[in-house]
Structures are given as C-alpha cells and as structure tokens.
Amino acid sequence: HTPTRRQRQMCIRDSLYGINVLDYLELYKKNTFVKQESYKLDHIAQVELGKGKLDYSEYGSLHTLYRTNYPLFLEYNVRDVELIEELEDKLGFIELIQSMAYTAKCNYADTFGMVKYWETIIYNFLKEQGIQTPPQKLRGQEKSKQIVGAYVKDPLVGGHNWVVSFDLNSLYPHIIMQYNISPEKMIKGKVDMSVEKLLAGKTKITGDYAVTPNGAQFRKDKQGFLPELMEQFYDERKLWKKKMIEYQIESESCKDPARKKQLNTLIKRAYNNQQVRKIALNSAYGALANQWFAFFSVDLAEAITTSGQLIIQWGEKIINEWLNQVLKTEGKDYVVAIDTDSLYITLDDLVNQVFPEDTPKTKIIDFLNTISEDTIEPVLARGYEQ
C-alpha cells in the first residue's frame, strides 16, 4: 500500500549503550545567553572564531563537489571538524558537561535536563549515608494548580536617572538553607500565613518549626538533605572561584610560557568546577517544581517562591524607608523595578542634592559605587537581620 505522510516521516532510532552522542549545536544553545540570528556552523564560527566553513558555492551542491573535486570535498569536511574543535578549545562546553556528569555521577545526556540530574545527585548523596530513596509513586503526577512564581514589580512609568541595582546572591539556595526546606522535614498541615501578612507585621512566627509565607512548616532539629546539598555546592563553588582568581592573578605576572600554559589549564578547570556548582544551585528549584521530579511538591516549590517574594519586597521596604529618611521625603517610591532577586533603585534625588548640575558623570558614578557598597549594602544587611 502507499504509505501515509505520517508513516513516511517515521524513523528508527537505535541506542548504543555506553556511547553518548553530544550535539555541539545543543551544547551551544544550552550554555550561551545571547540569541544568534542563525545557529548554522558557518555563522557561529564567524561570531566566535572570526572564520567560517569552506565555500563551495561555485559547485552548486555538495554532491557535485564530491563528484568533481574530491580533495576539496575532504578538506570541506575536515574544516568542519576543526571548527568544532576550535569552538571547544575556546568555549569548553564538552569539558563542562563532563564535569557536570562526573559531579552528579550520571550520563552525559542526563545533564541536558535538571530533573534526572538532580534525582541522581540526591540518590547518590543519600546512598552514601545508607538511606534508600522511597519508591517514586507520584512520578508524573498532574499539578493541581499553577505554582506561585517569583515577585516581579511593574516598572515605575517614565524615565529614571542614576539607577543602581542590587542582587540577592543565590536567593533560592539560601532560602532552602534558611528554612530547612526538604521533603523529609516538611510537617503535615499548614498554618495561616501569607507574604502580605508578614510584610504588614500582622502575624508572628512562634513554635519549633520554620514557617514559610505559604504556611508550610519544616522541622529544625536536623539539617535536611536538600539544604545540606545546597550548602555543600555553595561552599565548593566559593572554593573553586577563589582558586580561579588566584590562578588568574598569578597568570598576569607569569613570564614562564610553560607555567602560563599550565595556569591557563588550571583557570579553565577551576572555572568549569565553579560553573558546575552554580548550575546545580540555580537548577534545584526548577527540578523541585517539575511534576516529573521524584520529590515534586507544590508546597515545597511555593515555600521557596513565596519566601523569595517576602525577602525581595522586604528589601524594597528597607530601601524606601531609608531613602525617604535621608532625603527628607515622605512615601516616595525609589525602587523603580523588581525582578525575582534584583532591586533597581533610582538615586537621582540623592545625586541632585549632593552634586551641582555640571559635575562630570565619572565622578557621580564613583560616588554611587562607593555609597552602594559602603552604605546601602550595610543598610540592607541590617534590615534583613530583623
């Protein structure tokens, strides 16, 4: 019979166990953050390396090139391989994937998604402690509702001068550590709590449990496995970043070519190791909020997001109270925008009070950098200690 269109499109795919195929196109898309107008090898090579593929346009097609100029056909294919090799030398994405896989003890393919990746991390972590993970009865359960997300403030309308930004470092991992958010530590039953009530000071948390703004409660008697993993990855990342900076400083003053080459290798290795920890830290919440994750829970996910909402809006409250006091204004909103873990603050009124109109911009920028680090950051830190 004549095959249907659907049948003609079907193909057979074989899996060779023990062999992993990594598509550099997928690696590039996953690990770069600037959208390219094209992801063809020729364009990416031009962008990253300043050179592209061999041009065979005079032959019309690869088949014609193959039939009429076989040596050039071979050179064309060799050039493609060399471009991929040079891209890897510069970007190190395969080395990054290898580091991720060895850290989690998983297959290379498992690093492309965070659900399997984090399940493997947790399984091996608990296994080392003699703990068996429970059967995955709820795997693939349907979400009963949309999970509450991060807080994003609508930007204040209009143009704003002298805007500075403050980011809360690794917000979600620190929330997990702060509240001891972990599946085995969550208590059944929720209390009447909300972000709005906590911001307004209409409720007070008492008792032996850590309580998040969504009303979830967590035991504090012992650190949960998820906060412990967050702390481990965070400490390891700090260590690798410190090593990377030390190698970079030494490399800048190094005159010995052999040692400089060795230092470049060490810098790349330290960067990859800290990047692996960063990816793991930033992806933990995403896995936890995924319905296909073995430890998926709406309450756990919302414990993190609502805590993030509370913390970032508390920062907004601290900044506005302080600036209104310093600038002798009343009820003015100086926070022009908020996005998840970032505050964007206009210091235009402060600049106008301190500097005359003709002040060089570089002088104002230096002032804003200094006051941000020496004054505003400590104000935020004291405010969060409440």
Language-model features, listed with the residues they occupy:
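Single conserved hydrophobic/aromatic residue that forms the stacking wall/gate
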Residues: 1-8, 12
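Conserved catalytic motifs of the protein kinase core domain
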Residues: 7, 17, 159-161, 332-333
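Catalytic subdomain that performs nucleotidyl-dependent activation
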Residues: 18-26, 34
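C-terminal or mid-to-C-terminal helical accessory/interaction module adjacent to the motor/catalytic core
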Residues: 31, 36-70, 77
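Common nucleic-acid-contacting/processivity interface regions adjacent to the catalytic cores
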Residues: 60-183, 189, 259-314, 318, ...
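Conserved catalytic core of nucleic-acid polymerases
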Residues: 168, 178-182, 190-386
